[in-house]
């Protein structure tokens, strides 16, 4: 067993040869490297598979009772300072390593087909391998300096992949936005690390926790300074895990390729923030104000992410806000001190969300056969619908991922989310009400995405019902460069409808132009008018290379929840996760054995599942297919004609829609206050520098010039005149000097 741990330092570096060799190959042998590009995908998958096997072996050792292992190498040693590098293998490291490698392998397999037609294929795999290396280095780090180094490398790789299609201005802007937003959190993290070193004199986690808690217990350090350092440390995870108020970069990060969206949202960048808070939880526990702040930020993010997802039309942006909300649940659990529940939800959510993102990529891939290579169209749920018969396997896998995220048993996220909801009632009833309400919103917006995508009819074809051809087509080159051509806005999504722009429809029931009395619009859905080529092609199912990782993720979604089921009946113990995390931190169940019987479990789960089903029912009520076979919608029509109450309801719904569609106006606020303020300050500084600073300098020069010119003409260009003026000024100076001395004498 000991020899296994001795080689654990190799874990982060095993995938590293791929980006190194790829870079050298493209530099020295570009043609041969490009011709053998499938080999690089195989090598990336093979090396990451080695890490996965290694990680599983280490996890088995941890479950069977092995203690944590740490090995360090001293880099610089003197009497006052010692800097060490090392690796730490404990349950948290084992969990994260398995998560990164399993999701990473499946995403790499998926990417081999998804990115096969992209000229940046090799560049993509180089970035991905370096991304996995950076994340593995982060989770195996034994000290804060090492964490910060890999933390920045993880961020760098994410920026490269978000802006992968850098010739598209919107992708370049998304990359810059992610970079600037994370700079705020990373600067706080760096200051917090330096502050902790100033207090404790150590970067190593084990020494840091022991010294820090002893100083607090003995009141040997100022509590405000300690709180400030902990707050600055927490700022890093707030930005990296897209927590309020530094969440604004996450939806725009969807401009990167879909496979990287799956990896970022499941097991790498956003998971890094949750990992760091979990790693530093023994430090945060000693500061109650910070623990409350963590839970407060978590519950705000839970609610904000869910409300912002309600009206998104882009399928990937809807899933991005879903990720933001679920990360809020994890942060809430950590703030409550429920360490096990947070990590459990991190695991279950990772596989479910990876499945959903890969499913969305398959949907986008199939839609591109109809609308072309345009994210504006291929990701727009308004133009989808009726995909069930075209992509049945993708539909089934996406449905299972949706049900899991909604918290429907026995799928993975049900077990972890239910545990967080139960713990929230013990922590704060207010937080619990918000968390449970958001569980209903989660079910609503996830089934909204599902119904808009798969139910009904393929809406893009109804735009072409008139049979007219349009030469306008919006395409993206293989590098992602946009090619915009004129757009005809005379088409309507629903066929045979005429739009009267003078009539202003309410939001909940927009003006109904019925065909056979069976057409209605759906809430949280505004319909743009795109002009596309008249074509009768249909979406098609993705190839096996894309479907295989999705089917494997279905298995994880079905069964990974079993590792944390807290049942202990007749000596049968299912709770593998608790064995792995022994001893575990849980401030809410300090005197319990973490096991419940079946009756107590069903009693606790019934409420949360009922809320989820209520959200699903509302989604079905509002978003069932517009082209329904039902001829009588008297119930819906009577609901729509209710006088003053109807107007008030419309105002409420319109407010919610505007709030969600405009991202809670938070981006607008940042644009006006921060971006606009900084630009205004820059312009003011530029004006002051040009007019005042340069004015003084130039004024002195101009004044000296005119004085010199004046003296030149007074002297008449004769040396004797210059000497006379010189003597005259000297006499005046001496006269003033002696006159002042005389005054001082008297």
Curated annotation (Swiss-Prot):
Compartment list: Plastid, Chloroplast thylakoid membrane
CC annotations in GO: chloroplast thylakoid membrane
EC number: 7.1.1.-
Top-rank EC class of the record's enzyme: translocase
UniProt-recorded Gene Ontology molecular function terms: NADH dehydrogenase (ubiquinone) activity; quinone binding
One Pfam family from the record: Proton_antipo_N
InterPro entries for this protein: NADH_UbQ_OxRdtase_chlpt_su5_C, NADHpl_OxRdtase_5_subgr, ND/Mrp_TM, NU5C-like, Proton_antipo_N
Record keywords, A-Z: Chloroplast, Membrane, NAD, NADP, Plastid, Plastoquinone, Quinone, Thylakoid, Translocase, Transmembrane, Transmembrane helix, Transport
Membrane topology of the entry: Multi-pass membrane protein
Subunit structure: NDH is composed of at least 16 different subunits, 5 of which are encoded in the nucleus.
PANTHER family: NADH-UBIQUINONE OXIDOREDUCTASE CHAIN 5
NCBIfam families, sorted: NDH_I_L, PRK06590.1
Family the entry assigns: Belongs to the complex I subunit 5 family.
Protein name: NAD(P)H-quinone oxidoreductase subunit 5, chloroplastic
Organism: Carica papaya (Papaya)
């Amino acid at each position: 067993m000991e020899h296994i741990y001795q080689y654990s330092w190799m874990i982060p570096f095993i995938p590293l040869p791929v980006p190194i060799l790829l870079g050298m190959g493209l530099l020295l042998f570009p043609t041969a490297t490009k011709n053998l590009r499938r080999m690089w995908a195989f090598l990336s998958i093979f090396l990451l598979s080695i890490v996965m096997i290694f990680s599983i072996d280490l996890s088995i050792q941890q479950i069977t009772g092995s203690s944590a292992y740490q090995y360090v190498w001293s880099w610089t040693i003197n009497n006052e300072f010692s800097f060490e590098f090392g690796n730490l293998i404990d349950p948290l490291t084992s969990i994260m390593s398995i998560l990164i490698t399993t999701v990473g392998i499946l995403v790499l397999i998926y990417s081999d087909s998804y990115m096969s037609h992209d000229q940046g294929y090799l560049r993509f795999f180089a970035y991905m391998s370096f991304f996995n290396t950076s994340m593995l280095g982060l989770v195996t780090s034994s000290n804060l300096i090492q964490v910060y180094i890999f933390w920045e490398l993880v961020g760098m790789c994410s920026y490269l992949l978000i802006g992968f299609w850098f010739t598209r201005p919107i992708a370049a802007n998304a990359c810059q936005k992610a970079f600037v937003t994370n700079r705020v959190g990373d600067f706080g993290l760096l200051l917090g690390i330096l502050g902790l070193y100033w207090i404790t004199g150590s970067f190593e986690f084990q020494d840091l926790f022991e010294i820090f808690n002893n100083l607090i217990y003995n009141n040997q350090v100022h509590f405000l300074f300690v709180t400030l350092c902990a707050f600055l440390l927490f700022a890093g995870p707030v930005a990296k895990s897209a927590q309020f108020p530094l969440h604004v970069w996450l939806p725009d990060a969807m401009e990167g390729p879909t496979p990287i969206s799956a990896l970022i949202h499941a097991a790498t960048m956003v998971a890094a923030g949750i990992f760091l808070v979990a790693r530093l939880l023994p430090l945060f526990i000693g500061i109650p104000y910070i623990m409350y702040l963590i839970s407060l930020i978590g519950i705000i993010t839970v609610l904000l992410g869910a409300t912002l997802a309600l009206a998104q039309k882009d399928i990937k942006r809807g899933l991005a806000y879903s990720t933001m909300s679920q990360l809020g649940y994890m942060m809430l659990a950590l703030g409550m001190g429920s360490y096990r529940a947070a990590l459990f939800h991190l695991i279950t959510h990772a596989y479910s969300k990876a499945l959903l993102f890969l499913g969305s990529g398959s949907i986008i891939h199939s839609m591109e056969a109809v609308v072309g290579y345009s994210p504006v169209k291929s990701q727009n749920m308004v133009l989808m619908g009726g995909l069930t018969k075209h992509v049945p396997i993708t539909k089934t896998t996406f449905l299972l991922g949706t049900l899991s995220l909604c918290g429907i048993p026995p799928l993975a996220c049900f077990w972890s989310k239910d545990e967080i909801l139960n713990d929230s009632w013990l922590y704060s009833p207010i937080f619990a009400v918000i968390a449970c309400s958001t569980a209903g919103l989660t079910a609503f917006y996830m089934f909204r995405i599902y119904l808009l995508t798969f139910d009904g009819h393929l809406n893009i074809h109804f735009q072409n019902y008139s049979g007219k051809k349009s030469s306008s087509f919006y395409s993206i080159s293989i590098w992602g460069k946009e090619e915009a051509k004129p757009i005809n806005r005379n088409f309507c999504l629903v066929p045979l409808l005429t739009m009267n722009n003078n009539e202003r429809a309410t939001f909940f029931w927009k003006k109904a132009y019925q065909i056979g009395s069976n057409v209605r619009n759906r809430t949280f859905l505004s319909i743009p008018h795109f002009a596309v080529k008249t074509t009768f092609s249909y979406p098609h199912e993705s190839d096996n290379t894309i479907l295989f990782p999705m089917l494997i993720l279905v298995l994880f979604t079905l069964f990974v929840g079993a590792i944390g089921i807290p049942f202990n009946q007749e000596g049968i113990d299912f709770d593998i996760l608790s064995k792995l995390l022994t001893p575990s931190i849980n401030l809410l169940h300090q005197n319990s054995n973490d096991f419940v019987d079946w009756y107590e479990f069903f009693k606790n789960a019934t409420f949360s599942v009922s809320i989820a089903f209520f959200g699903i029912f509302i989604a079905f009520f509002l978003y069932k297919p517009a082209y329904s076979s039902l001829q009588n919608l008297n119930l819906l029509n009577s609901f729509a004609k209710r006088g003053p109450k109807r107007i008030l309801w419309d105002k409420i719904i319109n407010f919610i829609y505007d709030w969600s569609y405009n991202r809670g106006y938070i981006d607008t606020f940042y644009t006006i206050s921060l971006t606009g303020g900084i630009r205004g300050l820059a312009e003011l500084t530029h004006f002051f520098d040009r007019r005042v600073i340069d004015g003084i300098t130039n004024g002195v020069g101009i004044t000296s010039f005119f004085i010199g010119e004046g003296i030149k003409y007074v002297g008449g260009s004769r040396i004797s005149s210059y000497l006379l003026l010189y003597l005259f000024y000297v006499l005046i100076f001496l006269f003033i000097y002696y006159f002042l001395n005389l005054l001082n004498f008297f």
